[in-house]
Amino acid sequence: MPETATGATKYLQNLWDEREAAALAAEPLALLRYRSNLLGADLRITNFGGGNTSSKFELPDPLTGRPVRVLAVKGSGGDLRSMTEGGFALLYLDKLEALIARYRGEAHEDEMVSFYPLSAFGDNRVAASIDTPLHAFLPFDHVDHLHPDWAIALAASANGREKLDEFNQRYGRHIVWLPWQRPGFELALMLQGAVAAHPGCDGIVLGSHGLFTWGDTQAECYVNSIRTIDQMGEFVDDHARRSGRSTFGGAATAAAIDRDEVAAAILPFLRGAVSTTRRVIAHYDRSDAALAFANSNWAPDLCAMGTSCPDHFLRTRICPMFVGWKRDEGVAVLQERITERLVAYRDEYVAYYTSFATSDSPALRDSNPSVVVIPGLGVFGFAKDKREARITTEFFVNAIHVMAGATALEGSGGAAGPLPQARRAERTDEFTNFHNYVALPRSEAFRIEYWALEEAKLQRMPAEREFSRKIAVIVGGGSGIGREVAVQLAARGAHVVVADQNVASAEETWSHARTKSSNEMGMAAALDLTSRESMAQALRATILQFGGVDIVINTAAIYPTPDPSGASLEPMWSKTLTINVTSNHVLAAEAAKILKIQRLPASIVLTSSANAVVAKSGSEPYDVSKAAINHLIRELAVGLGPLVRVNGIAPATVVAGSAMFPRDRVISSLQKYGIAFADDESTEALRARLAEFYAQRTITRRPILPLDCANAICWLAGDQSAKTTGHVIPVDGGVAEAFLR
């Protein structure tokens, strides 16, 4: 067992390893990184990207060589769990302290941010966060600012100050309450003043926000943080047990037994409905916490209030959209309710913006919700990609925990006097209170959501890629052209589902493609082209994972190898036509069911062949099947337009890495064309011989590679070909006999 810092806890595990910390003792920044990673590893301690950590220590000034005090603090946008030493901003502490004399008051606090880069130590250029002065002005060497649900439950309670006094008495603590104040220079001075006014205090609860803790050493700071959070968890949970009340007023409905089936049926409609400004990716949460909230009596009221902690609503928006519905009403009624609620939600959001926007406010953003709560089903989150959608949903579940904690702390007589979150008594009416849970005033929420500093952060985000926000299913993605398509789409920002009859091959493809993307932006799926049910299940899995489908690509087919003896190919006719033609029709039909209710422009790309137009003998089943594909593409384009574009490519002799060219087919072709080879040559060597032979028969004299076909498919699948449908692009190096007419 590792040696750990002392500090008994009930819920949280003390992960501090004295031996590991001792090895980092000479590097204070490395030790700060270690502390930060431990804190960020547990979402009960702080949410993704939330909170920040800091240390103050001496470093030699790069100009004078003399030791100077510096502040190391988590840089803007960093996440504690994954922080590296390079993610911390380093600043001269004396320069930060000198800024107090430059401060012109709360109305001008945003201008102070421009001074932070001027305080940077040496060549450190990590962007300092808005919370930098909050750490700088506290007279402690090591400070943690965290957003644990248990602490925010206290911070968001109408009786929060009273309950904090009770907490301090119970645990022998001296934690101070501060009312709500937007993060910034003013709050930094309030923190400084609170510590000065309360000598010996060991933490601060920020109303409607979070928690500050500290220590004289890195280990003491860490232990103080987890001990405080753990005690707050015990305090909140004890109140919940003693209250005898049902969480959120009890259940109004039960979780739907078939919730995944209903979610799969409604998600494409819902995704399309909330993508009117820009396309989004979904995350579906049907955890116990999500269902308990969604199914509760109080969910409509609490949803309307919105979240409290600023970190929460920056992703969850001002409030989630609650859709009243019961399972026995059916999916059609749910669609109607979603449509009705969306109209109201957008109107309310525009009114919210109009009420508080000033001449210098950023422009109105997307008025669609990023979180949707549906009784019986759970919580749906939406964002630009899967990771952000998951985090958005996690943040709302954090908010659910906060609401549960705050309502559990409700006393029998309610809160007495002005709400403690209000810094000034005259503003207390701006805060809303429901069963002890206090939400931020809309005006304060607007000052966060449309803060010029937050807008600047959004503007610094990297440009989106060609297929960002798109979901692509690649059938036949386990090998050859399909594999290259999956890799290319992943590299260009798509969410990729690699579907193949050979699941191991599909998983291998995704394992490679994810290196061009991220772990959460794709998956492998089993798909049998001879089974409609298998196709439907693969598409259903895609919906539950990402929310819908935008692009369907099929590169899979079979080629019945001609028998050298000249035996009839008749036994292969039915199988070839089933897999190469009928399966494409069925795949398109199954996809169309989704695309029609999703109501977003979509694309289907099928794979034909030069053989479709070149008459010859020996491969009739394959050639005829590809001729049928050409016309199927045209028929589908007419039938599914204008919403869905349908196109295809017609490759020829793509030998490299192709499952269509197994060793026996390659040998058969080499024998057919009289190309010499040795029996002991590798399959790849034989393929290379055949590919070069084919290349010399084309106009361009260049072999056709899977990447060449993938590039054509990606063009047809993407917006650059938005006005092209019913078309087949040859990718054959120039075969005159295969010119399309």
Which residues does each predicted region cover?
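Glycine-rich flexible loops
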Residues: 1-472
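Canonical Rossmann dinucleotide-binding motif of NAD(H)/NADP(H)-dependent dehydrogenases/reductases
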Residues: 466-497
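Short C-terminal tail/terminal secondary-structure segment
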Residues: 562, 713-714, 725-741
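Substrate-binding pocket helix/loop in short-chain dehydrogenase/reductase
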Residues: 563-575, 694
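Active-site helix of classical SDR
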Residues: 588, 625
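Residue(s) in the substrate-gating loop at a strand-loop-helix junction
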Residues: 609
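Short, small/polar-rich loop/turn modules that mediate ligand/substrate recognition or access, typified
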Residues: 641-645, 724-726
